[in-house]
Amino acid sequence: MAKDSQKNLNVSNNNNVQCTMGRSSQNINKSDSKGKIKRCTYAYKILLCTIFIWICQCFYNKSYYVYKKDGRRNKGKKILGIRINKSLAEMDHTKYHPEYYDEVQENYDPYYGVNQYSDECESYKSEDDDSEEEYYNSTPRVTVLEPQTENSEDEENYEKTIVDELNELPNDKKALILSYIRNGNDNNMQLLPYANNNKQNTQENISRNKEFFRHFVDFIKGYKLFDSPVLNALLPFIFIAFVYCTITMLVGNVRYIIALYILAKILKMHYDYKHKENNNNNNNNNNNNNNNNNNNNNNNNNNNNNNNNNNKKSKKN
């Protein structure tokens, strides 16, 4: 009987150990699953925030494609891929690459007369006005900077700058700036080319970090990573999801917000208490210094009075 009782005790102990091991393994599995769920929620929130930022970049992407035919541009399907209205990611790219300015200017030239806000997108010019286009292309536009002088005698001491657009260059309309320096008479006009060293100096002054950032931004804008009509179509749904996620985050983390508020209050009270103590100590020190100064002044006055009295007595004697 004693042996049977010992066997039963051993079996019960083994069962208890197995139960505790099973419970601990279940707890470990539950904690692992909770950790995975938290990681998934964090990844979901990060992904949602990135998508929202992406949509903000594409928010003004109300562009359409047009085709060009006989000098006219009409609204239509994507044939040549000429973009009329730029998206937010493509705006101000001339800031990083000024050589693209001519290409943008060609798309936005006023003599094409593209009305972006009309449905038919009709041209303001007629088809027979090719001569006017040739006139605009052939005649150089010159800007003369006149001197800001009042006296006619000082007119020979200024530098006149003329900006001339050379349209004869192939596929490139760059401005050649020439400086006319007046030396005495009109016959002694000296024609000097404008030294184009400003770009080199500015590139030397730019740090490497800014240069890398400029190239990186141009790479992103060149591949149009933030230009997606699908995201524009899904904008309302993703915006609602983003708002819902932010509200759930705030509601779920109310206790952390309350704890931070209480901690801030405690820190403020501690700082105010220390500040009051310092002010009281400073006031006490100032009062003590004032009292000492008053006592010293009184002692000096008494000494002066005593000296005066002694001098008077000595004179009488």
Swiss-Prot record:
Q: What is this protein called?
A: EMP1 trafficking protein-7
Q: Where is the composition biased (Polar residues)?
A: 18-30
- Where in this protein would one find the motif PEXEL motif, according to its record? 86-90
Locate the region Disordered: 1-32, 277-317
Where on the tree of life does the source sit, at the highest rank?
Eukaryota
Q: Which residues cross the membrane?
A: 230-250
What GO terms in the biological process aspect are recorded for it?
symbiont intracellular protein transport in host; vesicle-mediated transport
* Assembly and binders: May interact with MESA. May interact with J-dot compartment protein PF3D7_0801000.
